[in-house]
């Protein structure tokens, strides 16, 4: 996934996740709030859409195929989503809300000394895991963003900006201690988050070039640690 971080736009991912859980956000296409069975049907349709995205181009996906996979009818699908793209948009929104775990890792991690390097490793692992888990949806987000769809573009900005802002706060905290001088915190954090996201998106491609993911992981973590703290990373054991 090619990544563009846009620091000017800030979004609270935690707040997004909370709002995503509200029943009124699960309204059917006719405006009604579905009951328990309706919510279960809607969730099953989303799960089937996500599963089909792993093996099928989203442009080739048809409502009838998703409905059949979910054990229901196209008419039922249209009760909840206007079209396939609308269902994928919901999956993308849920994916962005799940990005709060990346924000939490940055905010709660200890960035000093060897503990800081462990935090950088954990953040790198979390990015790799996040991209592997959400890769089918992220592909659609990326393609739709390139094509100018602002809905998907805003989701991508929301996901990456939240991490960037939190990491910039860590850089600024080191600067307040007289360390990591000479860099603008948001620019530094944006560069590091872009590296994390792009490498996470393409680490499987490195394997085809004979570059092990384990080695890529260490390389990225060392860059993140050095860029955040301005301290030399510890020598790998």
Predicted regions and their residues:
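N-terminal intrinsically disordered/low-complexity leader segments
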Residues: 1-40, 182, 232-237
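Hydrophobic alpha-helical connector segments
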Residues: 86, 90, 104-133, 185-192, ...
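Short secondary-structure transition hinges
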Residues: 136-165
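Generic hydrophobic, amphipathic alpha-helix propensity
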Residues: 37-49, 66, 91-103, 167
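Helix-turn-helix
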Residues: 44, 52-86, 90
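An amphipathic alpha-helix signature
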Residues: 46, 121, 125, 161-172, ...
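Alpha-helical DNA-contacting segments of helix-turn-helix folds
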Residues: 53, 87-95, 141, 163
């Amino acid at each position: 996934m090619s990544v563009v971080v846009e620091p000017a736009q800030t979004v609270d991912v935690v707040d997004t996740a909370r709002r995503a859980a509200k029943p009124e956000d699960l309204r059917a296409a006719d405006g009604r709030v579905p009951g328990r069975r309706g919510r279960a049907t809607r969730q099953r349709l989303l799960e089937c859409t996500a599963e089909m995205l792993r093996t099928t181009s989203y442009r080739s996906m048809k409502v009838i195929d998703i409905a059949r996979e979910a054990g229901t009818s196209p008419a039922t699908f249209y009760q909840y989503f206007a079209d396939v793209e609308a269902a994928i948009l919901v999956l993308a929104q849920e994916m962005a809300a799940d990005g709060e775990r990346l924000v939490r890792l940055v905010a709660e991690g200890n960035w000093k000394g060897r503990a800081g390097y462990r935090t950088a490793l954990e953040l790198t692992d979390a990015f790799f895991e996040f991209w592997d888990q959400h890769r089918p949806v992220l592909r659609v987000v990326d393609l739709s963003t390139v094509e100018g769809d602002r809905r998907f573009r805003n989701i991508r900005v929301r996901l990456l900006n939240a991490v960037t802002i939190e990491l910039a706060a860590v850089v600024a905290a080191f600067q307040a201690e007289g360390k990591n001088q000479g860099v603008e915190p948001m620019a530094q954090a944006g560069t590091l988050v872009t590296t994390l996201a792009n490498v996470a998106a393409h680490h499987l491609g490195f394997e085809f070039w004979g570059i092990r993911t384990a080695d890529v992981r260490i390389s990225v973590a060392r860059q993140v640690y050095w860029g955040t703290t301005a301290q030399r990373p510890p020598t790998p054991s």
